[in-house]
């Protein structure tokens, strides 16, 4: 009687069955997120159905009957075509792509762009109002058109940058369509894998990618790499046996997109496309919504501030103008002019270029940014949830320790392994190295003689590859050694025997004996031995030798390393002459009373750059959490070696071991670090997970499933953390998408992971993330400096309008002139600040709090507007009044002169000396005053640019000339001003005139005052950290 089908969750690394009944509270873990951020209920139910499997329990006959197929003959072509039409192609549905036009339009209307569109609309409204009242000037039409042009050009630039990253992403995709060897109509055929259907009989061999979910009906030495599902690369044996109730853990199922490492197998396709396990996880990722980036939130916040300031000031002065008996239409024009004067027209272009420059800089450092705004998000990161394999480690098994002659020796685990320091003169090492070399099926692919050993491609599993490369580095040409010691018989490793054995002729022409070499699980190998080799001599395997073995085995195993035992036996020539035929099925040779030679342990070692990178994270206040599918002991060992768990910090288990008491007796609060398994996490409530994340600074999650990685990310986000997640497998894609910034691996990463991520590490190196964090913090700092620089002149541009309205002076500076400041003299200097090097404390600060540490905070606004801004305005008016006074108009005579000044019919207006001025002469003087005001702002902006190089350090600590682009910006300011004044001074439509040389220097004392004032501000901040001055003057 067939058992009732059970439904299992994708707990891929768990050690026990996990029923979905236990996962009903999944939503509780989601932290109350909005509906868009998780799959809807019907979708979840559908995803559950996809795992409604009992195929692993069925006999071959039942399986043939269920799918209407035949193991020998396969499906008929006609039936296959029917199934293909019914189920669709065997491919994952690609993620929904945003149409290019929508991407382009988003660039046109996001953030600053809205402000500029409103500004342009207001300019045109002002022109219409003036036109109706018959006083129309084309200035506002030009201004509106230029604002629209700025939006379009910066939008095109941002779209181009994003499209470039998208194209690089597309190039990751496999260009060659995958093929599958299928039996149809009793013939073997090679067809595109997309055309496979359920019931097809497929054959796979070492090196092939499994083309669909298959139930194995034949297997010979088949091992698969499930890393695209589990994230871990330990080879998994595959057979035809039903070994586990959970279909995800039984050995007779092969999963779509996993790789067959060695051996051969035949299987019946049981799921295709989106119905495969990989398809299910990809569907889970597509249901997870992306959150707004922190920089997008900050820009939105800044737009609100600027809009609020602009509208508030505009309305106040609109009311003032009406109260002062101005015409309502004039008051509306004033309102619009004040709002437009507050809009930082050049800032949109500056921010876009700054993000692009940083993205390019990061690409050079192996970080490909898909979304420009993700650059800054990385800088805000407060928690990094990092995968272990390939990110923190080198993604290759490496020999770490050896034990022979009763000693543990340390092997070189660096990238090239050229510094092996252990004793190689011992006779025991000679025997051990021979076993390591001969008892190994891995081989180098031919034609790689010129490639460094550690980079050569090997056919074989991860452990065998490690042993092969280790032998090649120390002994030389392994393939030549094997030729000289010809293999005559072999028993491959299997999970039942837990050993691998081979028999060889020896290279010594005088020794006619066969050499049998064996490796495997240390306890199994020791059972087969009666002697042990010490210093090249065989000795009886007594209790003291066995105890020494167990001590070494426990020590190496406790380091999280995979330990193998090695032994050999010379077969006597009289019983086993050279003509002897060895039978590996009936085993007609001894497999006991062997000589134990030594132990060897392997680990996927940490990358050499990771400990320093983790240390930098700790200095920067970033918590690094390891999330892996690997064994807790291995995970903890790697965490300790890279500094995720500090040398002095203990887990509950460490304290229990040290005190020799049960784990339950230890007060959890005593432990500073925690290692949590997937099974423990499954039983935690969200509140317990929150408590864990709050109370422990050093955490390792081991044996976790894809859903659990998602739960961990959401738990971190509940603590108001900005979370970065690394991953490479399809299993990681839901968490990558949910994180504030998802980081996929460029080399080992699956396409699904790269699609879900915001950034791709081209070198798969954790240290590149830390580089990215520094770049992200730097861009936030530099954007702050850019905004502070840009906002400062707003007051100097706004005050002339206010004085014009309130005091009735001739207009000190016009809207077109303001535009030349915002888009002419200030653009290149603003961009130059993006090249500014980091201040010394950038990686010693805590991560910024996304709700408290704003891009534009109160301190920045007050300092820019009311401190430096007012100084600039005073400097501008000083030059303005100097120009008018030298021409005969004393400052007092200009008050309430506006109406007479602007009346076209008055051509005999008297100045303070009784001289008469025509309308044209007055207009020319107004242009001169406006040009002088423009130059005054430009001169003071040079000082403002220099002081913005730092926020805390002195300019002299930072270096005046380290950022050469700043000086390019300063020179560009001066050149633009010179061209406008002397080159285009005769073009009356631009409102510029040729200035006397003396007017260029009137504002210089104000520029020096700005510099000195800011240096004093920074000095007091450094001298009195935490004081009122620090809290209110550091922006």
From Swiss-Prot:
Gene3D superfamilies the UniProt entry points to: Calcium-transporting ATPase, cytoplasmic domain N, Calcium-transporting ATPase, cytoplasmic transduction domain A, Calcium-transporting ATPase, transmembrane domain, HAD superfamily/HAD-like
Keyword Nuclease: no
Result of knocking out the encoding gene: Mice are born at the expected Mendelian rate.
Lumenal side of membrane: 121-142, 320-331, 804-813, 878-929, 983-997
Keywords, in A-Z order: ATP-binding, Cell membrane, Hydrogen ion transport, Ion transport, Magnesium, Membrane, Metal-binding, Nucleotide-binding, Phosphoprotein, Potassium, Potassium transport, Sodium, Sodium transport, Translocase, Transmembrane, Transmembrane helix, Transport
EC id: 7.2.2.19, 7.2.2.13
MF terms in GO: ATP binding; ATP hydrolysis activity; metal ion binding; P-type potassium:proton transporter activity; P-type sodium:potassium-exchanging transporter activity
Record: residues binding Mg(2+): 728, 732
Positions of the catalytic residues: 387 (4-aspartylphosphate intermediate)
Keyword Ion transport belongs to the record: yes
Annotated region described as Disordered, given as residue ranges: 22-49
PTM annotation (Phosphoserine): residues: 954
Membrane topology: Multi-pass membrane protein
Tissue specificity comment: Found in skin, kidney and distal colon.
Reported induction: Up-regulated in kidney and down-regulated in colon in response to K(+) ion free diet.
Compartments it resides in: Apical cell membrane
PANTHER family for the chain: POTASSIUM-TRANSPORTING ATPASE ALPHA CHAIN 2 (PTHR43294:SF1), SODIUM/POTASSIUM-TRANSPORTING ATPASE SUBUNIT ALPHA (PTHR43294)
UniProt function note: The catalytic subunit of a H(+)/K(+) ATPase and/or Na(+)/K(+) ATPase pump which transports K(+) ions in exchange for Na(+) and/or H(+) ions across the apical membrane of epithelial cells. Uses ATP as an energy source to pump K(+) ions into the cell while transporting Na(+) and/or H(+) ions to the extracellular compartment. Involved in the maintenance of electrolyte homeostasis through K(+) ion absorption in kidney and colon. In the airway epithelium, may play a primary role in mucus acidification regulating its viscosity and clearance.
NCBIfam families named among the record's database cross-references: ATPase-IIC_X-K (TIGR01106), ATPase_P-type (TIGR01494)
Assembly and binders: The ATPase pump is composed of a catalytic alpha subunit and an auxiliary non-catalytic beta subunit. The alpha subunit pairs with the beta subunit of gastric H(+)/K(+) ATPase ATP4B or the beta subunit of Na(+)/K(+) ATPases ATP1B1 and ATP1B3; this interaction is required for the formation of a functionally active pump and its targeting at the plasma membrane.
Name of the molecule in the record: Potassium-transporting ATPase alpha chain 2
Organism listed in the record: Mus musculus
Lineage summary: Eukaryota, Metazoa, Chordata, Craniata, Vertebrata
Gene that this polypeptide is encoded by: Atp12a
